[in-house]
Amino acid sequence: MSDKLTIAGREFASRLIVGTGKYRSFQEMQRCHEASGADMVTVAVRRVNLTDRTKESLIDYIDRSKIFILPNTAGCYTADDAVRTAMLGREVGLSNWVKLEVIGDEKTLFPDNAGLLEATRILVKEGFAVLPYTNDDIVNARRLIEAGAAAVMPLAAPIGSGLGIQNPTNLRIFREMITEVPVIVDAGVGTASDAAIAMELGADGVLMNTAIAAAEDAVKMARAMKLGVECGRLAFESGRMAKKLYASASSPLTGVVGA
């Protein structure tokens, strides 16, 4: 893509961010990363072998000269746990960036807004670039930005559900009201058309994992997601035609017999 995604002063050529979980093998994960064109992938700190680096690890299958690793705090249910996990990721050399997750409900995996805000404030003070996974509440997003978040990542639907964009109105509001930091749709994308819709609504980027990893042909789906994000971005930049209630002829009447 010609335009770049900029977060915390760093530029990324791709507006697609992909994950590292649920793949059938590390080799498949690696092929999907290549097919997606993503230059940022998110890694759960809890999944990285931090004690014995001689054993095979998913990190071994990520080309860090081409791909930026975004650690995440998946599985954390309190602000304290999320902060400790982020700190651990930095200490072992992953990154001083973090996709911050503080989960508030085990069944829906919806975020705990209060805990998320608390952890954001702490980690920003500790020098992290914080990208919080949040709901599609503009008020809460504003609070996260005021706390120093480098981006906001509203969900499109529950994590891993594949339901697609469930509240396009709120995402459109995000686009209109948030200009200070990127808006990255996170969670709920199921197929390439969902990614395209998110981008058409004005999202700066899309993050996904299960939609690719759980596809019957994961590599092919990774390629589809790449094209979906690019397609949606181009459509957003193009400015779609206005919707009309009635028909409007696309061909001129000049030269029509009897006109």
UniProtKB/Swiss-Prot annotation:
What name has this protein been given in UniProt?
A: Thiazole synthase
Designated gene of the protein: thiG
Family (UniProt): Belongs to the ThiG family.
Lineage of producing organism: Bacteria, Pseudomonadati, Acidobacteriota, Terriglobia, Bryobacterales
- Write out the catalytic residues in the record: K99 (schiff-base intermediate with dxp)
Assembly with partners or alone: Homotetramer. Forms heterodimers with either ThiH or ThiS.
Listed A to Z, the keywords are:
Cytoplasm, Schiff base, Thiamine biosynthesis, Transferase
Enumerate the catalysed reactions: [ThiS sulfur-carrier protein]-C-terminal-Gly-aminoethanethioate + 2-iminoacetate + 1-deoxy-D-xylulose 5-phosphate = [ThiS sulfur-carrier protein]-C-terminal Gly-Gly + 2-[(2R,5Z)-2-carboxy-4-methylthiazol-5(2H)-ylidene]ethyl phosphate + 2 H2O + H(+)
Q: Per its UniProt record, what Pfam families does this chain match?
A: ThiG
Does this UniProt record's set of keywords contain Cytoplasm?
Answer: yes
From the Swiss-Prot or TrEMBL record, what is one GO molecular function term?
A: thiazole synthase activity
GO CC field? cytoplasm
Q: Name one GO biological process term.
A: thiamine diphosphate biosynthetic process
This chain's function reads:
Catalyzes the rearrangement of 1-deoxy-D-xylulose 5-phosphate (DXP) to produce the thiazole phosphate moiety of thiamine. Sulfur is provided by the thiocarboxylate moiety of the carrier protein ThiS. In vitro, sulfur can be provided by H(2)S.
